[in-house]
C-alpha cells in the first residue's frame, strides 16, 4: 500500500469514526421508542366481551403494546374515548410479569366495580379517583369524577423504556386540560399525607363541598409509587413455583 493510499484510508477511517460518534449522540438525544402502541377498531368478539360497560362499539378500540423482538404482544386491552378524545383503559391484560402501562383488569371485574359505584353513590356525588379510573367512572358509571391528569402521571413503564415515557404519557394525557394537573397533584399529596385529618380536609376541598367518595384500587399504590418514587417505594419478587 502506497503512502498516499494509506493516508486516504486513514482519513476515511477517521471520518467514519466521527460519523459513528455523531450518530451515537443523535440517537442518545432522540431515542427510538423500544415498543409500539397500536390502536385499532374493536372486533365483534371483543365488543361482545365488553357489553357490560354499555358503550357502543364506535366508542371502543383495541390496543396492543408490542416490541419487534417479541412475536406476541406484551399487553393488550380495550379502551374508550370520551368527547374530548381522552383514552380510557377499560380492560387490560399483561402478557409479561411486569405491568405494562396499567395493572391487569378484566372486563367482568371492571364492570362490577363501576356498577357498584353507580348503585351505591348518589347522583350528585363526587368520586375522587386516579385519572384512568376517573375517566371510566364518568363514561360508564355516570358519576362526577373530576380528577384527571394531562401528564398521565403514574403510567407503569419498565425502567428500560423510561426514555420513551414522555411520549407515551402525552398519548394518555391528550385531551386533558393542563389546569387539571394542580388538582391531581393535591390528590396525590393527600394520599401520601400521614396526617389523616389534614388529608381528609384536602380531599373534601377537591370535592368542592359536595358529597365525596374516594375510589382507590390496589393498583393505585403502584401508580402512586411510579409518580412519586421519592416518597413511596414498592418492590416485588417473583418466587419460583414449588411442587
Regions found by a protein language model. Give the residues of each.
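Short, Lys/Arg-rich N-terminal segment immediately upstream of the first membrane anchor
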Residues: 1-6
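Hydrophobic membrane-insertion alpha-helices, especially the h-region
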Residues: 8-25
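Sec-dependent signal peptide cleavage junction
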Residues: 25-31
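Extracytoplasmic
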Residues: 16, 31-243
Amino acid at each position: 500500500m502506497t503512502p498516499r493510499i494509506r493516508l486516504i484510508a486513514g482519513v476515511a477511517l477517521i471520518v467514519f469514526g466521527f460519523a459513528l460518534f455523531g450518530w451515537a449522540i443523535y440517537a442518545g438525544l432522540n431515542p427510538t421508542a423500544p415498543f409500539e402502541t397500536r390502536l385499532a377498531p374493536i372486533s365483534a368478539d371483543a365488543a361482545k366481551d365488553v357489553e357490560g360497560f354499555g358503550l357502543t362499539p364506535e366508542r371502543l378500540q383495541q390496543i396492543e403494546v408490542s416490541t419487534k423482538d417479541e412475536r406476541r404482544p406484551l399487553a393488550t386491552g380495550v379502551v374508550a374515548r370520551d368527547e374530548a378524545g381522552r383514552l380510557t383503559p377499560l380492560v387490560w391484560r399483561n402478557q409479561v410479569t411486569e405491568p405494562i402501562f396499567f395493572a391487569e383488569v378484566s372486563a367482568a371485574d371492571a364492570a362490577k366495580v363501576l356498577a357498584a359505584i353507580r348503585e351505591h353513590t348518589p347522583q350528585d356525588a363526587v368520586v375522587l379517583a386516579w385519572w384512568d379510573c376517573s375517566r371510566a367512572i364518568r363514561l360508564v358509571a355516570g358519576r362526577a369524577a373530576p380528577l384527571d391528569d394531562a401528564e398521565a402521571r403514574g403510567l407503569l413503564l419498565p425502567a428500560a423504556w423510561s426514555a420513551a415515557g414522555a411520549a407515551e404519557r402525552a398519548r394518555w394525557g391528550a385531551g386533558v386540560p393542563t389546569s387539571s394537573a394542580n388538582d391531581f397533584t393535591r390528590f396525590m399529596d393527600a394520599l401520601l399525607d400521614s396526617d389523616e385529618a389534614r388529608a381528609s380536609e384536602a380531599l373534601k376541598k377537591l370535592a368542592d363541598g359536595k358529597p365525596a367518595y374516594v375510589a382507590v384500587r390496589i393498583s393505585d399504590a403502584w401508580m402512586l409509587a411510579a409518580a412519586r418514587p421519592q416518597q413511596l417505594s414498592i418492590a416485588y419478587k417473583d418466587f419460583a413455583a414449588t411442587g
